[in-house]
Each structure stands twice: as C-alpha cells, then as structure tokens.
Amino acid sequence: MERLQISLPGLEMKNPVMPASGCFGFGKEYGQFFDLNQLGAIAIKATTKEARFGNETPRVAETKAGMLNAIGLQNPGLQGVIEQELPRFDDYDVPILANIAGSTMDDYIEVAAELSQQRNVSAIELNISCPNVKQGGIAFGTVPEIAAELTKEVKAVSAVPVYVKLSPNVADIVAIAKAIEKAGADGLAMINTLLGMRIDAKTRRPVLANQYGGLSGAAIKPVALRMIHQVSQQVDIPIIGMGGIQTAEDVIEFLLAGASCIAVGTANFTDPYTCPNIIRDLPHWLDRLEVQSITDLIGGSWNE
C-alpha cells in the first residue's frame, strides 16, 4: 500500500513498522507466527565481535507497565551471525537493520566493516549504550565527543548507511544527537531503555542478578515521545522512534512527535502479532485523520 511507504537511507520500507533490536531475535523465532515480508524492515539482535553468553540469571523481570532486562548482549558473535543467521533472510524481501555493539571503538569498527559488506544487510544500527572499557566504563553514548568519534569511525568503514541508537540515560540528548549528526550519521534510533531496578521485598535483594537493567514497555513511552519531539526539531536526519509502542495509535503519536518510522519492542513478547496488527490498523487511522500518506504526519505536533 503506497500510502504507508517510507523511504529512508538504506531502508526502502513498505510501511513504517519494524521490530526493535533485541526483541525479535534474528527473525526466525517470529516467522512461525506470520510472514515476515509484511514488515517494513527488521532490526536484528545485536552483533558483537566475539560470541557472548550474556549475564547471569535472572536477567528479566516484569514490571507493572513493562519489563526490565539485563540480557548482556547474548549473541553468536560476528562470524556466527554471518554464517548462521543472515543467510536465513535470503527468502525474504525486507530491509535488514543490523545492530552492532562492542567494548572498544576497534570492536565496533571491525564488526561494522565486515557486517556492512554482507548481502542481506541494508543498514547498520550503532548501539552506543555499551560501556567503553578504555574510558573507565563510561557508556559511548553519554558523552557527545565520544559518541561523535565512534560515529565518524564507523561511518568511515561502513558500506551501508549508519543509524545511531541513542541512550535516554543522559543529561542532554539533543546535544548528543546534534554531535552524532555532525559526525555523519545517516539517522537516529531512539530511545533505548531507561536504567531501572526491582527489589524483592521478601529476600531484600535485587530481582535481577545484574542488579540494574533496562526498563522498556509502556512505562517509557512518554519519555520517548518527549525526547523525539525535542531532537527531531534540532536535526535534519530521520529518526526511528521506539519506546512503549503497542498500537497503531501509538505509531501515529510517534510520527507526530517527529519520528519517520517506528520500532516495536517489548510488545512483541506479550503478543507476537503486534507488528502485523499495527500494519493492518494504520490505514484505518489515516482515513480517520483524513491523511493520504503516512509521511504527512511526521512532525505534525511541532509548533509552527
């Protein structure tokens, strides 16, 4: 349906809906529920240089309006993804956004250089919420200069467009977004999870083995909307919006805030049909709002 089509750097999308990285595995897990060709794009699970087994359990905890996770970037590593996971997409006609993570800048550069050359990778998503071991564990995405340097280095080696996934756990997300844009990013993805925790009143101990985890789901939607609304008016690159999206109405809100497309995360765990249901319902919302194209809604809430 043409009225749902979105064209972004590296991503020619039949609709503005994709699953968020880390909430859809490598796709095959959800292929048993619906045809993945329905999706606008697929953001796959983070890839690191070496295989990671993740954090100790328990590493997931339910909250009243979402969930906490401290998975620890579990994945088969760069070669495992290239040899085992990416070939599965040969049978699909959907752009693939490959999320990458690392502990050092060199890790990111090596993974981006090789992963971006793979035939099924349409764009790179840079996860800058990871701790930088050479900077005392400070997350790459919390300091504008470091985030910009990482973006510039990855852009220099990537064969495909680069989107940078922003952490909301910062003092000034606009400053970081502008620094990343200046460094050459093709787009942004926001927001990643908010740092949170749960404590078991009976044991008096944190519920997660890692103590703290990323909060996602409906609880963070207002924060995501606010940050996207602020950032989108200060940059000229597209934004993949995410954070608590469950329905087509949520999608409309994110587009009005300034996102160009969206990613569904936690809702995939509670209902594997969330993405196709949203895609089904979007045309009805366009009719209701008397809008011909989904692109007409982008930034519609900005003050003129």
UniProtKB/Swiss-Prot annotation:
Pathway: Pyrimidine metabolism; UMP biosynthesis via de novo pathway; orotate from (S)-dihydroorotate (NAD(+) route): step 1/1
Record GO cellular component, one term: cytoplasm
EC number: 1.3.1.14
Cofactor annotation comment: Binds 1 FMN per subunit.
Molecular function, one GO term: dihydroorotate dehydrogenase (NAD+) activity
Record: residues binding substrate: K45, N69, A70, I71, G72, L73, N127, N192, T193
One BP annotation, GO: 'de novo' pyrimidine nucleobase biosynthetic process
Disulfide bond entries: none
The protein's required cofactors: FMN
Top-level division of the source organism's lineage: Bacteria
Localisation: Cytoplasm
Positions bound to FMN: S21, K45, A46, N99, N127, K165, I191, G217, G243, G244, G265, T266
Enzyme class per UniProt: oxidoreductase
Listed InterPro entries: Aldolase_TIM, DHO_dehydrogenase, DHOD_1B, Dihydroorotate_DH_1, Dihydroorotate_DH_1_2, Dihydroorotate_DH_cat, Dihydroorotate_DH_CS, Dihydroorotate_DH_I
Matches recorded under Pfam families: DHO_dh
PROSITE patterns: DHODEHASE_1, DHODEHASE_2
Catalytic residues (UniProt): C130
Function text: Catalyzes the conversion of dihydroorotate to orotate with NAD(+) as electron acceptor.
Cross-referenced NCBIfam families: PRK07259.1, pyrD_sub1_fam
Record text on subunit structure and interactions: Heterotetramer of 2 PyrK and 2 PyrD type B subunits.
PANTHER family documented for this protein: DIHYDROOROTATE DEHYDROGENASE (FUMARATE), DIHYDROOROTATE DEHYDROGENASE (QUINONE), MITOCHONDRIAL-RELATED
Family: Belongs to the dihydroorotate dehydrogenase family. Type 1 subfamily.
Record's protein name: Dihydroorotate dehydrogenase B (NAD(+)), catalytic subunit
UniProt source species: Shouchella clausii (strain KSM-K16)
